[in-house]
Amino acid sequence: MFQWALEDLGDAWNANLTDIDGEHAELMAGSFSNDQPDFTYIQPYEVKYFSQYWYPIHGVKVPAFANLHGAVALDRELQKIRITVPEETEGARFEVSLGGKVICSDTVTLKPSEYKEYDAALDSDASYTIRLVSKDGAVLMDYTEDREQEIRMPEDNIDINETRSGKLPHQLKTAQEDYLMGNHVEQYRDPSWKGREYYRVALEKDPEYVPALIAMAEDCYNTAHYEEGLKYIARAEKVLCRWNQNPEDGRIFYFKGLLLWGLHREYDAYETLFKATWSDNVISPAMTLIAAIDGRRHDWRKMKEHAAYAMRKEKEHAICRTYHAIADYKLGDVGGALAQLREIVASDRLDHLARFALAYYAQAEGVVKKGESMADFYGMLYSNPSQTCIDVALNLMDAGLADMAAAVLQGLETAEVWHDWNLPMSTMAHYTLACICGKAGDGETAARHRAVASEHPYVDTFPYRLEEIDVLRDAVSANPKDATAHYLLGNILYDKLFYAEAAECWKKAAELAPDFYIPWRNLAVAHYSKLGDRAGAESLLKKAIEVYEKNNMDPKAGAAQVRKQEAGLDVLVKELNYVMCKEGADGRERLDYVLRHKPAHLTDNLTWDIADAYSNVFEFDKALAMLRDHEFVAAECQETYLTEAYTFALCCKGRLLRREGKLEEALDCFRRSQHIPANFRAGWWDTQALYYAVWFEAETLMMMGREEEAKAVAHRNVPFIHSGYSPYMGPECDYYVALCMRMLGDSVNSRKYMTHCIMQWENEVANDVDRKPIVTSLYWSYVPDAVKESKAAYTVALAYGRMFFGDSEGAAKLFREALSLNPDNLKAKFELYLMQK
């Protein structure tokens, strides 16, 4: 059971996620995994089997033990024992004992979901034994509570990007550690780190470390860097095959085969994959591609033989069972092929490759049974039909079955699919079909589908498959004036790390279709994040907004359509605001531009961005009004930005009031800044993020002569737990902790604490290695200079350190230095504003 959060945030999410504002809990279940961040592996075409059993336990409430035979609760708070069962149980003996002494005993007869409750004196510190034995003597439960499980609590899993985590690539001591950490971030889909960054450091430490070499080769395959991948394989092969040409682990030759396949070196790939099959661990995936190449050569006997070889490793193989049946059909065993396909479909109704092959061949032979028609095939595609059919088509094209591959995509044009999919045939489905038809010599059909695709640049799924690079290159080659093909090719090339080539594609798309706003926006992303032209991103985004407002905003449209149009504009304005902010644009100019171009109905994100823009020019009442007049339902993890915008604006207002001698009004601001308004429907992920609001409240109380109240408030910051739970708790939080320590009378230790922090911050400022910007779900397309951002954050902290020791001049100098590195620091800007006043 998973609850979203505690305190205000927990209450907010309970309200957001329930109809009656009751308690919300999320059921979390898995197999082959012990916890959410714990993973296992599934190999290509491997099938894992698992079972899950669910039954109601509401009667017993929180169980101390549960299995397939029942659940038992030991409710120490209410001094109750409860038992329930998932199936009818008659005359079973139920006992709860402590040290051999039975404290509860009964013969129970229960129906499913019924429960019995017993009074019992339960000791909070004791470990009880639970037993349930059927009337025929079978032991259904036998469990003794293990208190050690509660004692052995794991340590916090500190965020990678924190220096103290010890998980950064150059912090790890060995190539092995870097390889394992890289493997973990890949499994965890970490948004800021990629496995390749760790593998490269592993190879700095040990250039012959084979696991990292193979991992880099795999990464190169996944990003279509085939030639580079072969270089890593050559290095690994030189080490691994120094004395033995046949290593135990066949992945080195399997990935070599894939890389050769990616380069369209079919013969070399075939030979290399055979070499890979000498090792047991890659027989199934290697034989799959071997069987496909056999199909390309129309060697159906070999295709059948090699598909069967793969099936000996994985009897429920997702591809080779169908390849085997297709080979039988091609060899003339029609009845055997159809029988195999029917068996596959009966065992797995979601095997769409087999379902299509069955519909295709049954229709060709005139032996279609119930549920086997083409209409049945398309009618059961409940997820995106085009994506499923592209997958099927590419599996068929691998084996040279162009007629079937074309047929599965052609059927999308007229298919009646599940009602949620209004346009079953997507842009990429048209381009893929055009590519298949073109290779088959049907230029007329290919041209027709490319023409249709070119008219639909807005897609629901971006191209991501390696094969789609070739599909789009084919489209661009066939029609160099196809802006949609250039645009989509740029998208997939950017995803595969070909940044400069992607930008050229988007540039061409913008030239060919200047009224299509997305290429302009994508060029801004590339220039800002990858091409070293951050300043150029602003003009590109302004162009995107100009184009969008001209071509995508129709004031005569219906309300629902207008909202959709506004959502697109909202994103562009939000992104431009971010870029201008990061690049140090004049605050008033930025705010005026955003206010001129913002849509009538704002998203949550743009609302708090505008509030921050008002705070940036010190108009805190307007910032607070923006936040007050909007109804928020913040997305997960974005609450932090909303609450920070609110707390910061109120604290700044309070500090200005305090300068005017209005202490009561200032105190009210500081206190309100720590309580979320109802319209926010949010809270703090970590209430320690209120560290500065807490200090200003305490300091104001002290200024008012209310010393005891002030110290009680200051105690909320001491001790301070560095949990890394909130991205807004920058290093300067320790400055406020030290201030609170000093207020509480511990002057010596506060100075030691501050001195220790300053020394750490100075080291961080000097460190340019392994830096990443703070991850945000809002602007991750725009990747700022992580080294500058880190230096800026720690320089701000050093400025506060100067303030602690009374050096205002030194603090001002450091604040200015920090803003030159990263102009997007409202705290530094406001401190300078106060100093100047």
Residue ranges and their predicted role:
Residues 212, 246, 252, 286, ...:
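TPR alpha-solenoid repeat register
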Residues 199, 233, 273, 307, ...:
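Hydrophobic/aromatic packing residues within the alpha-helices of TPR/SEL1-like helical repeat arrays
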Residues 65-173, 354, 435, 439-465, ...:
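Long, contiguous interaction/recruitment modules in multidomain scaffold/adaptor proteins
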Residues 183-184, 209, 218, 243, 249, 258, 283, 292, ...:
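Residue-level recognition of tetratricopeptide repeat
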Residues 1-47, 55:
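A contiguous, surface-exposed recognition patch within enzymatic or periplasmic domains that forms
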Residues 195, 229, 269, 303, ...:
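Single-residue signature of alpha-solenoid repeat helices
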